[in-house]
Amino acid sequence: MMFYRLLSIVGRQRASPGWQNWSSARNSTSAAEARSMALPTQAQVVICGGGITGTSVAYHLSKMGWKDIVLLEQGRLAAGSTRFCAGILSTARHLTIEQKMADYSNKLYYQLEQETGIQTGYTRTGSIFLAQTQDRLISLKRINAGLNVIGIPSEIISPKKVAELHHLLNVHDLVGAMHVPEDAVVSSADVALALASAASQNGVQIYDRTSVLHVMVKKGQVTGVETDKGQIECQYFVNCAGQWAYELGLSNEEPVSIPLHACEHFYLLTRPLETPLQSSTPTIVDADGRIYIRNWQGGILSGGFEKNPKPIFTEGKNQLEIQNLQEDWDHFEPLLSSLLRRMPELETLEIMKLVNCPETFTPDMRCIMGESPAVQGYFVLAGMNSAGLSFGGGAGKYLAEWMVHGYPSENVWELDLKRFGALQSSRTFLRHRVMEVMPLMYDLKVPRWDFQTGRQLRTSPLYDRLDAQGARWMEKHGFERPKYFVPPDKDLLALEQSKTFYKPDWFDIVESEVKCCKEAVCVIDMSSFTKFEITSTGDQALEVLQYLFSNDLDVPVGHIVHTGMLNEGGGYENDCSIARLNKRSFFMISPTDQQVHCWAWLKKHMPKDSNLLLEDVTWKYTALNLIGPRAVDVLSELSYAPMTPDHFPSLFCKEMSVGYANGIRVMSMTHTGEPGFMLYIPIEYALHVYNEVMSVGQKYGIRNAGYYALRSLRIEKFFAFWGQDINNLTTPLECGRESRVKLEKGMDFIGRDALLQQKQNGVYKRLTMFILDDHDSDLDLWPWWGEPIYRNGQYVGKTTSSAYSYSLERHVCLGFVHNFSEDTGEEQVVTADFINRGEYEIDIAGYRFQAKAKLYPVASLFTQKRRKDDMELSDLHGK
């Protein structure tokens, strides 16, 4: 019974007779009666899943005023993965949004017992994250810096301090650790039951032993659910079905892709130590040893994330409740050995049980939330990557905000279901990817690491040709993109194995590519960019785009407009360039990972008009970016047409012949601020055009380049990218893009009212460029992204992206500056004067480096100074 007390089944047994009904109108109904009650025929919201996520969503929706909610659980409440959760609540995460979710969960669970009267076993133990290597310690220092600035106490401690906090630990191989004192342990099942109880008291109806068969959809909108006990009409459906979320999504009349897959997850339970551990004993995370350790009733609970995980398929009839899977001591042996090395005194301790339970993982190790791009009203919260307890409270809150208000209070793009496409939902892909993901939970992740499984899923027609020329690849939205090109004299194996927080081994390679972009001409394959065409029989396309986009698109044919697709709050839902092909046709180019999100937003807001056509043409065109001053010479020679600015001005688009190929869309822009052209080539001509470009370009010093060079070029020019620097909570006025907004273009557009108000009231954050002056790129840790920014010693924001500028010979960071009141912490208006008068530091893993803040690209400042000098010289000669 000790095992089941740990997992809080006793909590269900000690509950009042009304627990199995949960309807606030029938609190005295017995469990048997509850299961036999008829379901309601309609509701506003139906939630599938009675675990930590489903009950959290129900709890928060009811707190926000929605009462007509039905929660369905196919077995018993909290009897799925929630029941087997190890009960560790940890706030130490790499992503800020995950840190905030876990912090909210911690505070929520702390007060649940007082709110509901249900004991949750909440005990504040703190956590200690061990480092056996200097790189691991650097990683912890980066996390520590991020935790501190959002108000989560943590500190880097010595091995000696570790031994003082946990006397059973062997610390001889440690170089340091991170202590997070407010982390906790809790009974996850009891937390779920407490959330359900509170939701029930707020009017939520909860029915167990009721299976959802499929979701009913009409014209792309949720209309109801079919259960084994009848139908319920509803406006919203929330899939919180855990490991069954994938299959439930595919069972719909209009399938919803939810890419997740389950693996077996092991942990052991021991009997109490001779001197039982105190309940406040800190939880230990030894990621280098691949294990976690927590106190459990005076003994030990310890599991981990092994290098060779065992994926589980979920075809066939679903189990109503998850059972303990078969023990596998041979498989667990490496984790057990690691545990005994860390805590040698456990050698003689009696082990009670080896628990084997399923955990779901996603292709990128981040949970899945949000509305389906295919079905309006279909929301998902699943794929918690063994962090369901830590994220459950915060994730449930954000999803509830999404449903009630139309968007969450934080930027959750990194967790949005729409970051995936159907291509990531292949069961074979998921099986292979989760076998990589599960070990990565504790692997050391240095900047710019890449997944190794599920690769070469989407490729340019030039992939083999570029690969043969030394391309090293990264993956974005399933698309292979070149990082850089390895010269023949470089050690390829050494480059592939090079992982560091310091100066990377590819530094010189990218320097050569950047230099070529500035002095000669380079080619970058950018075929992964999202491409849409919007056409109409009349003026419908222009009218719709004028309403959806902030800039004025009523421009002459052939002109390109940089613009944004904004939400009601004025934030960027999409950042793109649009070329007017003719009076009734437009060509739209967006970031790679915007493909699903942008399509869903357009379809949601475009009228149902048979005279209006939206087409995804991403796959139809190969995109080559010709960057550099000699790009004009290459293209002139290949097209036999003048390409000088007089004949081909900036931000202009024209269909041309290049080599033997016709119909090439040539655009005078490069996404870098450097001169050059984008070529959008029908895929059947791609190889020919590339070969011709490289052949003719030889005399002009042409070479291939990759996205690392592009990143360096665009950051030093202060070019912000959507998803990295700006998001749906960023307005054009906050990132210096007022010129891309036409408030007086003659018609209303989404977000206009919010921008007018912001223009009057001022902005509360501002995207700023930072140049590190006292930073030694050869010896010091590099900035990558997410580093805290300090102004006059006070925290004001974080970096969003960073790169080494080979022109300035300095690191350049982009990031948002806020103006927090020193007295109240409230945000105040940020002005140019506020930014310019501050002295700044960037915190890189606990070390602060002085930085100069700029609101405009340095190149522009140099140009302005040169023009001023020229004017002064002219005036002098005039005198």
From Swiss-Prot:
The keyword Amino-acid biosynthesis does not apply. InterPro entries: FAD-dep_OxRdtase, FAD/NAD-bd_sf, FAO_M, GCST_C, GCV_T_N, GcvT/YgfZ/DmdA, GcvT/YgfZ_C, Rhodanese-like_dom. The keyword Transmembrane helix does not apply. Keywords: Mitochondrion, Transit peptide. GO terms for cellular component: cytoplasm; mitochondrial matrix; mitochondrion; pyruvate dehydrogenase (lipoamide) phosphatase complex. It comes from the Eukaryota. It holds the Pfam family GCV_T_C. It is found in: Mitochondrion matrix. Its main location: mitochondrion. Residues 1-27 form a transit peptide. Transmembrane segments: none annotated. Belongs to the GcvT family. Heterodimer of a catalytic (PDP1) and a regulatory (PDPR) subunit. Decreases the sensitivity of PDP1 to magnesium ions, and this inhibition is reversed by the polyamine spermine. This is Pyruvate dehydrogenase phosphatase regulatory subunit, mitochondrial. It comes from Homo sapiens (Human). The lineage of its organism: Eukaryota, Metazoa, Chordata, Craniata, Vertebrata. The gene is PDPR.
